[in-house]
Amino acid sequence: MAEVADHVPNVASTLIDTLIASNRGDRHAFSYNDKRYSYQDVAALMNRTGNLLHGLGLEAGSRVLLLLPASPARVAGMLGAIKAGMVPVLGAPAQALEHCIAIVKPAAAIVHQKYLQEAEAALAALPRDAVVVVGSDVRGHKSFVDEVRGQPSWLAAPDVRADAPALGFWTGAAVALMSHAELAAFVHGTGDLPGGGDAPNPAAAAIGAMLRAFARGEDATLA
């Protein structure tokens, strides 16, 4: 009989919820457009986004394509998906989106309005209700701001298999995935994020630095 991989705590929960539980939620996490976000703010965004994804009918293991610039929405999409047991994949809008979607096979996508025009043809492969747009020009899609606002700010984090995918980066030709065990080790200083190769994901380095700052409960540069 095959040995079942050990289960581990959810990485997003250990990153953020641990700070809240230890009364460090009022610490400054990052700033965006002159607004300061505390770790309590990050926790609420993460949980509301995870609940939004559940509301779209996504299940554990579902992939969520993120086409977003450095912003609170990208943090929320990434951590919310991970905490909900899903797999966020950081896309790069200029990198062959049709091929990306064919390989990633996302169940949903969160897209910034500034990428929507160039991405819309590729996103037609997804159900229209599965595309959520950040910004005011949603073009008939769900509005991220409106949808998140109506979600509960609490979300249970299931334990996950250590070898289950937690986070992915589109490299231009393939998806580079990290397991929960690998991501947990990374945020505490061991190893590197994937996303290299001939067409590295431009977000990988900045996201890695931000996650490590989160693990220390420090001010982070938004990614």
Model-identified regions with their sequence ranges:
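ANL superfamily adenylate-forming
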Residues: K114-G189
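Structural core segment of the AMP-binding/adenylate-forming
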Residues: L56, L79, K83-D146
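AMP-binding/adenylate-forming domain of the ANL superfamily
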Residues: E3-H28, A44-L45, R63
